[in-house]
Amino acid sequence: MEKQELVKRYIETLISSPINLVGYDNFEEAYHFLYIDSTLPMKAEDLGQKFIDVGTGGGVPGVFLAIEFGASGFLIDSVCKKIEYVKNKCEELKIENLEFLCIRAEELKDKGPYREYFDSAVSRAVSKIATVLELTAPYVKVGGKILLYKGPGYTEELGQSVNAMKELGVKLSEVRKYTIKGKDRFLIVFEKFDKTPEKYPRKVGIPEKRPIR
Ligand SMILES: C[S@@+](CC[C@H](N)C(=O)[O-])C[C@H]1O[C@@H](n2cnc3c(N)ncnc32)[C@H](O)[C@@H]1O
């Protein structure tokens, strides 16, 4: 199926879902605030070949990135019914470059070969920057990127993440500003320059409750 047709079908799937996946029931809004938001600030080279989407919910941004750029996505979320729904719909649409796992990001380190495994990590609307860095950095290769979708509040969160960045082996490389229907949005791009200590991510809930300071 052609890319734009796949995007259209996937959005229709999201807005008609019986479980509340994305908070939009209008096609045009969902098209802009989900698909355009996911793809506009991204470049194919950011993702590399394999990326992880932590807290993908309804497959955002992971499904749209896989369709748009052809990279292989590994999409995780702690809510199994969301992952099941998204997985089934992607299978129906024959989107083949995606894998899914229902798991907390904190627990992925004990499952499979995923430590320092991905070329990049993406995450949108999951938690504050310091928390999300702890949930993503351990799974990205040295030299890879972490790309976080944020609103205008990102500056304060970034200021509170200086120690987390140092501790996790990541540094800020770029902030890409873009606008969706008059709303300012930012893609915060980090580079992983060093290995992340084995103790990260800490136990379930700790990255959220006690972000690295
Ligand atoms: C507000 S939703 C955002 C979903 C999607 N990324 C989007 O932009 O529409 C946050 C999602 O993150 C998931 N989540 C939160 N903490 C998580 C964790 N530690 N590990 C895996 N998933 C997590 C939640 O289950 C939820 O589906």
Regions found by a protein language model. Name each.
Residues 1-48, 52, 81, 87-98:
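Class I SAM-dependent transferase core
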Residues 58-70:
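Conserved SAM-binding loop of SAM-dependent methyltransferases across substrates and taxa
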Residues 72-77:
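Conserved SAM-binding motif I beta-strand of class I
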Residues 102-109:
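Conserved SAM/SAH-binding loop
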Residues 109-120:
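A short acidic, Gly/Pro-enriched loop at the edge of an enzyme's catalytic core
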Residues 119-131, 138, 152:
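A short SAM/SAH-binding and catalytic strip from SAM-dependent methyltransferases
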Residues 140-142:
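Helix-to-beta-strand junctions that scaffold the AdoMet/dcAdoMet cofactor pocket
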Residues 160-213:
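SAM/dcSAM-binding transferase cores
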